[in-house]
A protein has these predicted regions:
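Noncatalytic, helix-rich "gating/capping" subdomain that lines the substrate-entry/channel surface
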Residues: 93-358
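Bacterial N-terminal signal peptides
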Residues: 9-16
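Positively charged n-region of N-terminal signal peptides that target proteins for export
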Residues: 1-6
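Zinc-dependent metallohydrolase catalytic domains
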Residues: 145, 353-490, 494-655
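Bacterial Sec-dependent N-terminal signal peptides
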Residues: 16-37
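Hydrophobic/aromatic-rich, well-ordered segments within soluble, folded domains that form packed cores
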Residues: 49-69, 208, 554, 561-566
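N-terminal post-signal-peptidase region of extra-cytosolic proteins
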Residues: 40-46
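Active-site-surrounding "flap" and adjacent substrate/cofactor-binding loops of secreted or lumenal enzymes
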Residues: 36-38, 54-57, 62-120
Length: 655
């Protein structure tokens, strides 16, 4: 893709090279057998498979080898990453285009209807009036007050105010500037002298470098697939917090008419605010200009727009998707509503909800059978599982007061600015809410229903499954049930459910409060199993001679392993009535579907750049490193040797 949007930035691609598994550290080693013979049978996925590869050597290559050959990277368009999540993003983009073109969302339709090159002068005048306000600020105090006014207008200056959920209650939260796209050339096009343009961009670059250096958890995970936007958040008392002698949060609260005495944020974000207060007047002015111009440049009528609904409609893609996914855009909830109504059958939500309840029952059954936990800890685990909330697709009830309204504006740019204003008003109305609907809307406020994301929030003991997961390629009603249980079930629902009990989620109780509910011995047993899983992944290479970091990816690996075990048990119990060979065939198709769900190809360079710090293992390892820990995979595919073989007593089982 030439332009990255939140839903497409999936740092969980795969690659067309062989996964290397180091058996040197496995003292048991594979048996002497060297049969290396695959089971010969038809599969729904035959066109993607490479049967010249033994499933026990590289299950990922066995399943997807032909597809990888047929879909090389880089593509002719220069794409470094292709695959399932990119397809999901493209499907969502096309749906948004159709919804807009058909007038099914009046705000989006009006935005395009108003777009006119003749508006450039008046729009530029409005934008530059804000720059003039900055120039006229005579003191640091006046500049800080002006920045508070800009936050009220929806500018990330330096952050936006958004609804944040903590222990199932909506608090005011903050989110630092998400995307830095401004260049000096763009600034000059708006009539700002070249020297000042360079200084503005340099100020933005300096701030961006500082934010990155703080390594805020929320900032790091913002562009990840299946990221929890609430991670690292805590309730911070700001009533007496002064930064460099300035109570700017207090000033901001008065300006917004919002109680900011307690903010749901992480300490890194608050320290960034403290740092900003050390800026002098001139530095604040340059940075504020960056924040204003960086947001608004893309909404000025600077080029012709192609408003066709074809996939190649670049203008429509950019303008509507920017307005729908931009930080603090009021269009997000409105377009999310339209997307769920017009792009997703209502029955999909009911079916995904039923799948969740089946998997919850399967997980509960598994907990009861664990021999490494005492009954006391099992009871606590079941209590947490039973209390886990599941927010699927869209809220049960629609709330007009939490969605943007169409207002009369003369130009598209002015309407966009109004939508940002509305976002702040909606946030204000949500503070203090505790209903399930409010919690779901709060998540929509930060990403939109059309974003490819699902996440577990330990602070709320809840799973949010955004609506884009309820359509192909994640949930495909044209496919047999084994596909949907392996992809939506194992890789999404079961994965997120298990996050509630991974190395981090296990530290929170049923209501989202941090609490150690483990007996000392059970906690030790749990940590021992985690160590085994770390060791297992430390031996896996996703690029030749480049090993996975088992500790860094531990939480995701626990969730992957639990997800496939829970989904498989649920599928076999609830959907498979056949017996004997036919039953085993359907079970094998489940495992093949699991690999299909991680169908990606990426360049080696892209893999090296993204997986060095990613908490997710590379998808080739999320397949090979997971299936070879499940006993059923060995039985079903008749695996008794091969590079992936792990001796029975070395196969890690946690959840």
């Amino acid at each position: 893709m030439k332009k990255n949007y939140l839903w497409m930035l999936a740092l969980c691609g795969a690659m067309a090279f062989t996964s290397c598994i180091d058996n040197a550290d496995n003292p048991s080693g594979p048996p002497e057998s060297t049969s290396h013979k695959n089971i010969e049978e038809a599969s729904v996925f035959s066109k993607d498979m490479d049967l010249s590869v033994y499933a026990g050597d590289n299950f990922y290559q066995y399943m997807l080898g032909q597809w990888l050959k047929d879909n090389p990277v880089p593509t002719k368009d220069g794409d470094l990453l292709i695959g399932a999540i990119i397809t999901q993003k493209q499907n969502a983009t096309k749906a948004l285009a159709e919804i807009t073109a058909k007038g099914q969302n009046l705000i989006a339709f009006t935005l395009l209807s108003l777009y006119d090159h003749d508006d450039l002068q008046s729009d530029s005048t409005l934008l530059m009036s804000k720059i003039k306000q900055i120039d006229e600020a005579g003191t640091k105090e006046a500049m800080l007050q002006l920045m508070a006014e800009f936050v009220k207008q929806g500018y990330p200056c330096p952050f936006v105010i958004l609804p944040e959920v903590l222990m199932r209650k909506v608090y005011p939260g903050i989110e630092m500037l998400r995307e830095y796209n401004l260049t000096s050339l763009k600034v000059e096009r708006m009539g700002i002298p070249d020297k000042e343009a360079i200084s503005i961009v340099e100020a933005g670059d300096k701030w961006q470098a500082y934010v990155k250096s703080k390594a805020s958890k929320k900032q790091e995970k913002m562009l990840s697939y299946h990221y929890n936007p609430h991670e690292g958040v805590m309730l911070i008392n700001t009533a007496r917090r002064r930064s460099a002698g300035t109570d700017w949060i207090g000033t901001l609260g008065k300006t917004l008419d919002m109680d900011l005495s307690a903010i749901a944020a992480d300490e890194d974000e608050m320290s960034m605010v403290d740092h900003l207060m050390t800026y002098n007047l001139d530095s604040l002015k340059l940075l504020a200009k960056y924040f204003i111009l960086n947001r608004d440049y893309k909404y000025l009528p600077l080029k012709e727009l192609d408003i066709n609904t074809d996939e190649g409609s670049e203008g429509l893609f950019e303008y509507i998707c920017d307005a729908a996914t931009d930080q603090s855009s009021g269009l997000a909830t409105s377009l999310s509503h339209s997307y769920t109504q017009h792009a997703i059958p209502e029955s999909n939500k009911a079916e995904a909800t039923a799948m969740f309840e089946e998997m919850r029952a399967a997980f509960r059954n598994r907990i009861g059978k664990y021999d490494w936990m005492t009954d006391v800890t099992k009871a606590k685990a079941m209590e947490k599982l039973d209390a886990m909330k599941y927010y699927c697709g869209w809220p049960d009830n629609w709330h007009a007061e939490w969605e943007a309204k169409l207002v009369a504006e003369e130009t598209s740019y002015r309407l966009v600015c109004n939508l940002f204003n509305q976002y702040v008003d909606i946030t204000r109305s949500m503070i203090g809410q505790t209903s399930d609907d409010a919690i779901f809307y709060a998540d929509w406020m930060s990403m939109g229903a059309y974003v490819a994301n699902a996440f577990y929030s330990p602070e709320n003991n809840s799973i949010a499954l955004l609506a884009s997961n309820l359509v192909s390629p994640i949930y495909d009603k044209t496919m047999p049930s084994y596909y949907n249980y392996a992809v939506l079930g194992a890789q999404t629902i079961g994965h997120e459910m298990t996050h509630g009990f991974d190395n981090m989620g296990s530290k929170y109780n049923a209501i989202g409060k941090k609490e150690n509910w483990w007996t000392p011995q059970d906690e030790q047993n749990f940590e021992s199993r985690q160590k085994l899983l770390i060791d297992h992944f430390n031996k896996l290479q996703y690029v030749p001679d480049v090993y996975c970091d088992g500790k860094q990816t531990l939480g995701e690996n626990i969730a992957d392993l639990g997800g496939i075990e829970i989904a498989y048990e649920s599928y076999m119990k609830n959907k498979v009535t056949a017996s004997g060979g036919e039953r085993d065939y359907l079970a094998r198709e489940f495992y093949r579907s699991f690999a299909e769900g991680w169908k990606f190809n990426m360049t080696t360079e892209y893999a090296l750049e993204n997986f060095k710090t990613d908490e997710h293992a590379a998808p080739i390892l999320r397949v090979n490193g997971i299936v070879n820990l499940t006993n059923e995979w060995y039985r079903l595919f008749n695996i008794s040797d091969g590079a992936m073989y792990v001796a029975p007593d070395k196969r890690v089982s946690i959840w």
